[in-house]
Structures are given as C-alpha cells and as structure tokens.
Amino acid sequence: MDQRILNVELRSKTGKGISRQLRRSESIPGVVYGKGIESVSVSLKTKELSNAIAGEGGRNHILTLKGGGSLDGQMVIVADLLQDSLKGLPLHVDLHKINLADKIKVKVKVNLVGTAAGVKEGGLLDFAMHEIEIECLPSHIPEHLDVDVTSLTLGHSIHIGDLKELPGIKVLGDPKASIISVLGRAKEEAAPVAEA
C-alpha cells in the first residue's frame, strides 16, 4: 500500500457552528487519535482528503500528516469517515495514528476473479460479503483480497475459512461466514415428447 501526504491544521474551536464554517470554506473537521497521543482536533481540505483516499485501497492508504504542529510527520489511516448521505461529500473524518511496527485491523474489499461455473449453468451469484476484516502490519495492507470463483458450482459457497493464507495477513471473522454463493437449481433436461 502506498503512502500519501495529507495537510492538516490544528483547530482549537469545536462544535456545529465551526464545522459548518469549515465546510463552507471547502474544509472538514477531523480528529487524530491513537496510541501515545491525546485526541487532537484538526481541519483539512475536503478535496485533499478525497484525493488521498481515492483509488484502490481507499481508506486503507497510509497517510503522512503535514502541518499540525506535533502531528507533522505522523502516519495515520482513516478510521471513520462521515459522509453526506445524498451528495457523498465528507463531513467529518477520524484519523487513527499508526506505528509501522504494530499490527492493525482494517477492512479490505473482496475482488472476485473469474466467472463461477454455477452462473454458467443458470445460477445466480449471491455476493454476501464485499469487505473482509484482516489484521496485519500497515505496510502489508493489500488493496483488495482476490477470491477465485471459477470452480464455484450451483448450491455451493466460498467461506472465510476457505481463503488461502497470505503471508503476514490474518483474516478475521467467522470461518463459516459465507463470502459468495451460487444460488439456483441445475437446468432440467427437457422431458421426452410422447408420440401420439
């Protein structure tokens, strides 16, 4: 996972009024917290945040903070992002300070590879789990987890426990939880036509 720069400014005032003022000036409020530091209120440009988390990996990019006094040079990931439900614009962000030597838990997207054999037989793909929680060092966070579905037949599923192990990455969650299934019945062969 690549590292990106994010400019932040310390802010001493908090509350709805200040948050609205920030949003009008194309900035958003945020907070930085983590092991070894007290929570610090910050503001940052909306466009910079959007660019920093754009593309594969999204919120799991390691961000290096610039500005913000004692926060300068700290590495963070986006722990939570509150967005406007209609416009999709960021409203508030929680940034979690990380240490590259400590494992963290993050959710990564599931990327389906291939076409399931059961779909070719007329089945319907049920993609139940679009993200999977993993634990690893920040430098080992994958952009996504590939799940090969080519051999998935009708009435069968791929579960968390079926995923192959990746070096340095521990997949979390119930091993019996279904990630993807193929629903439906096999096509019935046409019944022979009786001669009159």
Curated annotation (Swiss-Prot):
One of its GO terms (cellular component) is cytosolic large ribosomal subunit. The keyword Glycoprotein does not apply. Keywords: Ribonucleoprotein, Ribosomal protein, RNA-binding, rRNA-binding. The lineage of its organism: Bacteria, Pseudomonadati, Thermodesulfobacteriota, Desulfuromonadia, Geobacterales. This is one of the proteins that binds to the 5S RNA in the ribosome where it forms part of the central protuberance. GO terms for biological process: translation. It comes from Geotalea daltonii (strain DSM 22248 / JCM 15807 / FRC-32). One of its GO terms (molecular function) is structural constituent of ribosome. Coiled coil: none annotated. Belongs to the bacterial ribosomal protein bL25 family. CTC subfamily. Part of the 50S ribosomal subunit; part of the 5S rRNA/L5/L18/L25 subcomplex. Contacts the 5S rRNA. Binds to the 5S rRNA independently of L5 and L18. It comes from the Bacteria. This is Large ribosomal subunit protein bL25.
